[in-house]
């Protein structure tokens, strides 16, 4: 192999190596966004859409202090805590809708979707 061919081969290998950088890590999607030991609610089915992450709850998802886009807009949950959670139709934990058992993950029954305004842990 001539010197020019060797130089071209080495240069080509160096260019190829520089373009094969590792791909950046992908951001978590769906239910995988829910951290351990938290109650997570999602605006879409199957853990899609806006996520709300809770340790103790929120007495009014419609006010300015909580996550945006979840008031009367929760379709799926993942309860990663060792306690039951209550979902309520009104602010201040009134107008009960349903309970979420410890470690439950999935879509809320159709008749209870898009009704929740407050939620909190209710018992271990």
Where are these regions (language model features)?
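Compact beta-sheet-dominated domain cores in extracellular/mature segments
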Residues: 2-124
